[in-house]
Amino acid sequence: MSTQTLERPTPTAASMADNVGEVTEILKLLSAPARLLAVCHLVDGEKSVGALAELTGSKPTTLSQHLALLRAHGLVSTRRDGTTIYYTLASDEIAGLIAYLHKAWCKA
């Protein structure tokens, strides 16, 4: 039986240069502890602002401001149910990044 490895194409200098600004912006957004902690909790699925505030120890109003910034930059998306707003990670790429960070540094 043969095993196949999935090979990712090697990025070119030009493609890396094209994307470095976007990646830098994402890392800046995640450098705030409250925002990083909130998105870490979203890896497990959607959560309301209230649930995230309880999990992170943040005030709901402060956390709402952080989440609004993440939403404006496309890192999270929302769903409204009555007066409750639920947040989820907006892409598989963001979920993968956060899952990697969690696996590498958040060992129990």
PLM regions and their residue ranges:
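Intrinsic low-complexity/disordered segments
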Residues: 1, 62-63
